[in-house]
UniProtKB/Swiss-Prot annotation:
The gene is accA. Pathway: Lipid metabolism; malonyl-CoA biosynthesis; malonyl-CoA from acetyl-CoA: step 1/1. It is found in: Cytoplasm. Residues 31-292 form the CoA carboxyltransferase C-terminal domain. PROSITE patterns: COA_CT_CTER. Its EC number is 2.1.3.15. It comes from Rhodopirellula baltica (strain DSM 10527 / NCIMB 13988 / SH1). Its main location: cytoplasm. Belongs to the AccA family. It holds the Pfam family ACCA. This is Acetyl-coenzyme A carboxylase carboxyl transferase subunit alpha. It catalyses: N(6)-carboxybiotinyl-L-lysyl-[protein] + acetyl-CoA = N(6)-biotinyl-L-lysyl-[protein] + malonyl-CoA. NCBIfam families: accA (TIGR00513), AccA_sub (NF041504), PRK05724.1 (NF004344). GO terms for biological process: fatty acid biosynthetic process; malonyl-CoA biosynthetic process. InterPro entries: Acetyl_CoA_COase_a_su, ClpP/crotonase-like_dom_sf, COA_CT_C.
Amino acid sequence: MAGPGLEFENEIADLEEQIASLERNTDRSEEIDSAIRSLRLARVAKLKETYSSLDPWQTVQVARHKNRPYTRDYLNLAFDEFVELHGDKHFGDDRAMLSGFAKLDRFKVMVIGHQKGRTYKERAACHFGCAHPEGYRKAMVKMKMAEKYRLPVICFIDTPGAYPGIGAEERGQAQVIAESMFMMSDLKTPVICVVIGEGGSGGALGIGVGDRVAVLQHAYYSVISPEGCAGILWKSHEHAPKAAAALRFTSDHLLRLGVVDDVLEEPLGGAHRDHHQMATRMKTYLSRQLSELEEMPVDLMLEQRYEKFRKLGVFLEES
């Protein structure tokens, strides 16, 4: 599933090309098989070396990889009996926001998540994962439905940010994101949020208030994109790598700062290389968290959720 390589993966791509070339050889010999084994070992070693030392800008590139698993991929691989629900009961159906009933092991759940699309046609229809106000209203309607039927809510976050167009602003983009966060803070059912790729600004926060907030190892969660930050501070997108380093939005920083509760380890070389393995890890994590949350009294759950987000950004200075 890896697909086109990233710029910093050139050596890995060369090894994979050599392996593929030898495997296509119809006249296989022990010498060729031995060479394939050696190249595979070299590939694994290079993947470990590369992915154990990604810089923040490289992490952004991995998070944006076109073959990275999206919300619908997790629905297909980790969940059963998904029934999609459409519309916001107000304006329309935003394809950048998926929602519906599903089963995860023994749990009946409501799944909500950003969707980017694979082909250009799909991406355009999904606005490249940038939801409009109707997308967030759609999410809120489905969350209230989940609360009514006492279903846990699982949110998959993967967006560069909320859609920035004039129509979205006219229909109350900022207000609806604030309303969604407010509603989620008091939703009387367990909520688990996972950043699976890009966690961009208010677009991510709009479905990001939960009892558990996790991030994939090579995802990022930020107040602004590196390009946006570079454009504001240095008037040029060329400084995006510098901005990425300054924003401290990678999984290790997020965990250390208390922005997320857990980091989900990705398969070697990133989630885009093995959708099935990543989906299995996701399923295990979600099932474990749901088992813990179902035992918690609702009042205590809401109190802990509220305190979790009240503490974000608080720091003490020594005089």
